[in-house]
């Protein structure tokens, strides 16, 4: 018997993000640019995945206004 078999974890299903959740996300993106920049630069593989995703899914609905200027520079 492995040590982890005695643990039982029950996760609640994910909740849908409503407008207040989206507002919180945009506030974090706008206010914490230095931390986000450091995270992006420290994880080049994730940055590449994000760049590829944005390049393939870019459309007129995506708002770059919510992104910090430095993140926008890195992603484009």
Swiss-Prot record:
Pfam families per UniProt: Pox_A3L
Cysteines joined through disulfide linkages: 17-21
Family: Belongs to the orthopoxvirus OPG128 family.
Taxonomic superkingdom: Viruses
Function text: Late protein which probably participates in disulfide bond formation by functioning as a thiol-disulfide transfer protein between membrane-associated OPG072 and OPG08. The complete pathway for formation of disulfide bonds in intracellular virion membrane proteins sequentially involves oxidation of OPG072, OPG128 and OPG08.
InterPro entries: Poxvirus_A2.5L (IPR007952)
UniProt-recorded name of the protein: Protein OPG128
């Amino acid at each position: 018997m492995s040590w982890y078999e005695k643990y039982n974890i029950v996760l609640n299903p994910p909740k849908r993000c409503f407008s207040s959740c989206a507002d919180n996300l945009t506030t974090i993106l706008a206010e914490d640019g230095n931390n986000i920049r450091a995270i992006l630069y420290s994880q080049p593989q994730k940055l590449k995945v994000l760049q590829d995703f944005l390049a393939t899914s870019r459309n007129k609905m995506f708002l770059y206004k919510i992104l910090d200027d430095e993140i926008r520079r890195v992603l484009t």
